[in-house]
Amino acid sequence: MKKIVLYGGQFNPIHTAHMIVASEVFHELQPDEFYFLPSFMSPLKKHHDFIDVQHRLTMIQMIIDELGFGDICDDEIKRGGQSYTYDTIKAFKEQHKDSELYFVIGTDQYNQLEKWYQIEYLKEMVTFVVVNRDKNSQNVENAMIAIQIPRVDISSTMIRQRVSEGKSIQVLVPKSVENYIKGEGLYEH
């Protein structure tokens, strides 16, 4: 049975902390396939500072090139509108019948799983991988995997804000992503 990891997020923009999560999960689980799953619109997040989706996909590909593993699953982008993980996983599972699916979330998402659409069915379809960046270890449900990762306080919001204020984002994102953001004039408004 094939082991597939899905790492979802808005990735607006993708940054160094996302890379650390991907790397830690990849090396811990050693999956056959690893997918970055950019959302079109998350139902649990406020939406502002949105850029053309092609920019996000380009920056994710830059991260994949740098990490040396991974692919992009753009199912939610193609579907458009609000993205419910349940719908995405259900469709993905139909395409990958003989696969064991792992879905990466942070402790912030773990602590609000009860708000997720069709969460009980979703728990039957995937094994949640809960990444914890806090000093305290996170207890998770028995059917889930907890992975402790180094704490790096970087957020996409912070990066967008720094760019709009004309501040440096060096090392917050890889050089290729930094150059792309500057070259395309993203987040400057």
Curated annotation (Swiss-Prot):
Biological process annotations from GO: NAD biosynthetic process
Pathway named in the protein's UniProt entry: Cofactor biosynthesis; NAD(+) biosynthesis; deamido-NAD(+) from nicotinate D-ribonucleotide: step 1/1
CDD domains, A to Z: NMNAT
Catalytic activity, as annotated: nicotinate beta-D-ribonucleotide + ATP + H(+) = deamido-NAD(+) + diphosphate
GO MF entries: ATP binding; nicotinate-nucleotide adenylyltransferase activity
Keywords: ATP-binding, NAD, Nucleotide-binding, Nucleotidyltransferase, Pyridine nucleotide biosynthesis, Transferase
Listed EC numbers: 2.7.7.18
A Pfam entry, by short name: CTP_transf_like
InterPro entries referenced in this protein's UniProt entry, alphabetically: Cyt_trans-like, NadD/NMNAT, Rossmann-like_a/b/a_fold
Domain of life: Bacteria
EC class (word): transferase
Family of this protein: Belongs to the NadD family.
Function, in words: Catalyzes the reversible adenylation of nicotinate mononucleotide (NaMN) to nicotinic acid adenine dinucleotide (NaAD).
HAMAP family: NaMN_adenylyltr (MF_00244)
Protein name: Probable nicotinate-nucleotide adenylyltransferase
Annotated organism of origin: Staphylococcus aureus (strain COL)
